[in-house]
């Protein structure tokens, strides 16, 4: 974490290695090799880029023990790739307002002997809340959801390390704080073991025909395809269903673009109901990113027309509740 790492590294007596404001995968690979980096952190797009670079170049990652991932969800395919090279990927979640850590996805002791796929499922989530943080998850009806890993709602948190208000921002304070609780803006689910999973940002969750679709879950599934370099999913306006998902995909250099779209759809059909499937897949050269490396869905919405993206799809093709 940009706030926490300098302090923890110093407290541990570790050397700091800073890659600069806009490092590319080659720079990161070089620093890991030459500086003997053991622990590093960054958003998933950084490590997806490193993965692709390593596939085409000989890179020595033997010094690297752990990657801490935050900012957005890491695809399980990414965690598996680094596991196969002896590098642990540790999910964490937090906010500046939380000073900054909220949860860490370490395995509970009763899961240490579980099978790899079970452990991977837990490690692919944002984890368990750190001590001192109280939380609840609220649905559209202001009711707390069940801890079943299926229902989801907005995550609210409170605790001694969480700010109680913003400085001189009365409108934001009224919107984001209620009775001592901070409304995080993250839509999450929580499983019976207490592991939270970020489903989406509240502003990015796709509302289609009265149902919610997780753009993050679709993105991670698409990026599990071997011929996909990057992918993001946004909701575009739809006359009948309110919104429908559209996927923006950056094909890997080796990809056959003529068959990739059907390959992606086949992958999604095996995992998700019909009404979750994207109404369109657009190939792009690069997903726009924010200054911190997160995907900028706002830029995509501004660049592309929903009418054009959904052209040719009849409304009933992806109707919620019309799954086979």
Predicted features and spans:
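AMP-binding/adenylate-forming catalytic core of the ANL superfamily
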Residues: 40, 159, 164-165, 187-276, ...
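AMP-dependent adenylate-forming
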Residues: 204, 262, 297-312, 316, ...
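Conserved beta-loop-beta connector loops within the AMP-binding
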Residues: 132-156, 192-193, 255-261, 296
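Active-site glycine-centered loops adjacent to acidic/histidine catalytic or metal-binding residues
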Residues: 71, 94, 127, 186, ...
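Conserved AMP-binding/adenylation subdomain of ANL enzymes
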Residues: 1-38, 53
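Gly/Ser/Thr-rich phosphate-binding loop
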Residues: 11-14, 34-42, 48-121, 134, ...
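AMP-binding/adenylate-forming catalytic domain of the ANL superfamily
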Residues: 272-294, 312-321
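Conserved ATP/PPi-binding loop(s) of AMP-dependent carboxylate-activating enzymes
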Residues: 111, 128-132, 143-175, 211-213
């Amino acid at each position: 974490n940009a706030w926490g790492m300098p302090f923890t590294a110093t407290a541990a007596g570790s050397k700091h290695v800073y890659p600069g404001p806009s490092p590319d995968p080659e720079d990161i690979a070089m620093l890991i090799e030459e500086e003997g980096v053991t622990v590093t952190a960054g958003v998933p797009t950084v490590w997806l880029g490193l993965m692709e670079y390593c596939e085409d170049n000989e890179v020595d990652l033997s010094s690297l023990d752990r990657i801490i991932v935050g900012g957005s969800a890491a695809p399980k395919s990414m965690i598996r790739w680094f596991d196969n090279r002896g590098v642990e990927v540790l999910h964490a979640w937090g906010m500046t307002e939380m000073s900054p850590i909220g949860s860490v996805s370490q395995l509970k002791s009763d899961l240490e002997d579980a099978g790899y796929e079970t452990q991977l499922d837990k490690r692919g989530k944002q984890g368990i809340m750190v001590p001192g943080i109280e939380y609840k998850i609220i649905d559209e009806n202001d009711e707390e959801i069940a801890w079943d890993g299926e229902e989801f709602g907005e995550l609210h948190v409170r605790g001694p390390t969480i700010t109680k208000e913003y400085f001189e921002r009365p409108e934001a304070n009224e919107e984001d704080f209620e009775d001592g609780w901070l409304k995080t803006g993250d839509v999450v689910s929580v499983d019976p073991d207490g592991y939270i999973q970020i489903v989406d940002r509240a502003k990015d969750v796709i509302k289609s025909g009265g149902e919610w679709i997780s753009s993050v879950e679709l993105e991670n599934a698409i990026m599990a395809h071997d011929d996909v370099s990057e992918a993001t999913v946004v909701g575009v306006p739809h006359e009948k269903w309110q919104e429908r998902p559209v996927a923006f995909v950056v094909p890997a250099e080796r990809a056959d673009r003529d068959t990739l779209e059907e390959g992606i759809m086949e992958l999604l059909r095996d995992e998700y109901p019909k009404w979750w499937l994207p109404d369109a897949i657009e190939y792009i050269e690069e997903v726009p990113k924010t200054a911190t490396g997160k995907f900028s869905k706002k830029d995509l919405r501004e660049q592309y027309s929903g009418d054009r993206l959904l052209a040719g799809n009849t409304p009933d093709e992806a109707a919620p509740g019309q799954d086979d």
